[in-house]
Amino acid sequence: MEKLTILLHVAAVLMSTQALIQEQRQKAKINLFSKRKPSAERWWGDNGCSLWGSCTVDAECCLGNCGGMYCSLLR
């Protein structure tokens, strides 16, 4: 009976250790994915500029070329 109790304690410690390690791995994966940016955001940055949206000044366009009412893709 005593051996069975010791065996159950060892099994409980091993299972809790495994659960703790898996939890840390999940947190690491979440941190990895949260740092990644979508492709468009990596390419154009996150400065709120527009490719072909409406504009009033050059600074509102990603390419810095406001064609009067809309951003121009040509410089």
UniProtKB/Swiss-Prot annotation:
Expressed by the venom duct. It is found in: Secreted. Disulfide bonds join 49-62, 55-66, 61-71. Coiled coil: none annotated. GO terms for cellular component: extracellular region. It comes from the Eukaryota. The keyword Membrane does not apply. Residues 20-41 form a propeptide. It holds the Pfam family Conotoxin. Its main location: secreted. The presence of a 'disulfide through disulfide knot' structurally defines this protein as a knottin. Inhibits voltage-gated ion channels. This is Conotoxin Vc6.15.
